[in-house]
UniProtKB/Swiss-Prot annotation:
Ranges where the tr-type G domain occurs: 10-290
Cellular localization per UniProt: Cytoplasm
SMART domains, per database record: EFG_C, EFG_IV
InterPro entries the record matches: EFG_II, EFG_III, EFG_III/V, EFG_IV, EFG_V, EFG_V-like, EFTu-like_2, G_TR_CS
Organism whose genome encodes this protein: Paenarthrobacter aurescens (strain TC1)
Keywords assigned by UniProt, alphabetized: Cytoplasm, Elongation factor, GTP-binding, Nucleotide-binding, Protein biosynthesis
Function: Catalyzes the GTP-dependent ribosomal translocation step during translation elongation. During this step, the ribosome changes from the pre-translocational (PRE) to the post-translocational (POST) state as the newly formed A-site-bound peptidyl-tRNA and P-site-bound deacylated tRNA move to the P and E sites, respectively. Catalyzes the coordinated movement of the two tRNA molecules, the mRNA and conformational changes in the ribosome.
Family: Belongs to the TRAFAC class translation factor GTPase superfamily. Classic translation factor GTPase family. EF-G/EF-2 subfamily.
Protein origin, superkingdom: Bacteria
Molecular function GO terms recorded: GTP binding; GTPase activity; translation elongation factor activity
The protein's name: Elongation factor G
CDD domains: EF-G, EFG_III, EFG_mtEFG1_IV, EFG_mtEFG_C, EFG_mtEFG_II
Amino acid sequence: MAQDVLTDLNKVRNIGIMAHIDAGKTTTTERILFYTGVNHKIGETHDGASTTDWMEQEKERGITITSAAVTCFWDKNQINIIDTPGHVDFTVEVERSLRVLDGAVAVFDGKEGVEPQSETVWRQADKYNVPRICFVNKMDKLGADFYFTVDTIISRLGAKPLVMQLPIGAENDFIGVVDLLEMRALVWPGDAKGDVTMGASYEVQEIPADLQAKAEEYRAQLVETVAEASEELMEKYLEGEELTLEEIKAGIRKMTINSELYPVFCGSAFKNRGVQPMLDAVVDFLPNPLDVPPMIGHDPRDEEKELTRKPSADEPFSALAFKIAAHPFFGQLTFVRVYSGHVEAGAQVVNSTKGKKERIGKLFQMHANKEMPVEGATAGHIYAAIGLKDTTTGDTLCDANNQIVLESMSFPEPVISVAIEPNTKGDQEKLSTAIQKLSAEDPTFQVSLNEDTGQTIIAGMGELHLDILVDRMRREFKVEANVGKPQVAYRETIKRAVERLDYTHKKQTGGSGQFAKIQIAIEPMDTASGELYAFENKVTGGRVPREYIPSVDAGIQDALNDGVLAGYPVVGIKATLIDGASHDVDSSEMAFKIAGRMAFKEAARKANPVLLEPLMDVEVRTPEEYMGDVIGDLNARRGQMQSMEDAAGVKVIRAHVPLSGMFGYIGDLRSKTQGRAVYSMTFNSYAEVPKAVADEIIQKTRGE
């Protein structure tokens, strides 16, 4: 069967399961694998036995950190699932999985509705135009409210949900759903009946009398919405004709793929209810690789020349590497999404991003951390490859005679860092190996050396992210080291333009000297596009020889690593080389690089330099009686209130708070609210640090 599917892309779905932490994504994935026959025993996250959570830390913490790719079959369709982490520190995993998916299932907690991380992941899916269906999970939970959750999809996500099912019962009495497409009830046998099928079988019944009117009302809304899918359907609807089941399904499919609406289903993955209809919906409504527009890229020799690749085995081979993972036996696994063409295991391809030849050793389709070897990789599928030496996340692999560079992924800058000091020389060597492997796997993990102290500084997306990286260094690479306290990753920028600064670098020490004269301008630059630095050359008449111009740029970039205020990296700068002069004998690339570095430092001091800090979106859910204490505490941490609202019996407070004020927050919040409040935090943006606070930080870093 697998071979037939490979040739028929209509029967393939590449999907992600995405949600807020603890909404039940991994449990939902486990149920899918159980019902599709991949697993014979259900793995529970809280037992540490889940298939997709296969790294030691994931099993211990009960959270998903790396996106495991799993292949399964449902109703003769192949579904490739990527289980993505919901914890904000691992947004990079979500980002890269969404980049290579065609559709997604957004899982919501039936009690909490849309939570902050659900919003973050939803926005990421919007960025990559990923069509979605919604699964309101945990309908068996105390306080679960399907209709409240649907309302939050409208109010918090600004999305258009299409209700496909209504829950029958709630909390402990949740037994099934009303299917609004076929106007019938699907009821799962309860535990009391001793359900030996683990929810694999359910009964089709009449709609309960108390839900009949509501079901008819929602069915009418569904049909009215679907009629908008095409003129033919609208005409038929307005003339009072019944739309057939096939017409309704086709209309929903079309509108879902265009992201005009999001079909909503409900269930309880933990109690084995509602998962199969959601799987049917994945096949019925989410796109196959042929429904997705052709991939756009550019010619590696000419960035202006746009190229496209259709999802067909007849097109030239192209694939995007979206994840690197270490494997206990094979070494490095590179996960790739093949967008066009076909490639055999053992073939030579080109990494067009880096301009290097690569050989694909072996190819696998993955089931979490079990591998199924395959002979070749075909358009529309996700594979793991071994043997790729130079390929990292975001690189394109392609046919040597038809090269293309596919659009890559953009990753956020780290916001937090710790110093790490190996205990012995042997540990230093192990640390180097660990850093090399971990940074290949994770683009948001950055490493630098503090030249003043000789310490290695590792930076990441949050305290949990760094905890897990350090934990992996100790466990997998046996590194023994002292780890410092977390530090905020501050940045520096300028507020004023300097229109002209002349700098001459001159050194005469017998024999040939060094000479470079340049005139530069610098100005602030908006970083919203993700671009942190730009360089322009306006020199005319060869006054600075062409071969020295990249050296000036390199010198300025060198200076950006180490700002003039407190030595933090500088962002949001446009530098222009206006004029200069050289000497036939004494000028060199090094002389112009030094001139670029020193000129920038001098100009930056005159450009009103300021310190920037990461500002976080913080959401706290607290019982009403603690609201005053929580708000007072956030204000004391320099927080700015954004909104307050009621949700599911608690107060939801949203604020912007500097990251520096959030260290140790969880302990303080617990003691202020007797452990009854919860919070979540996502990165918002970098913002200017108030002068009094900035002066304190600068004095501290200078050791004053």
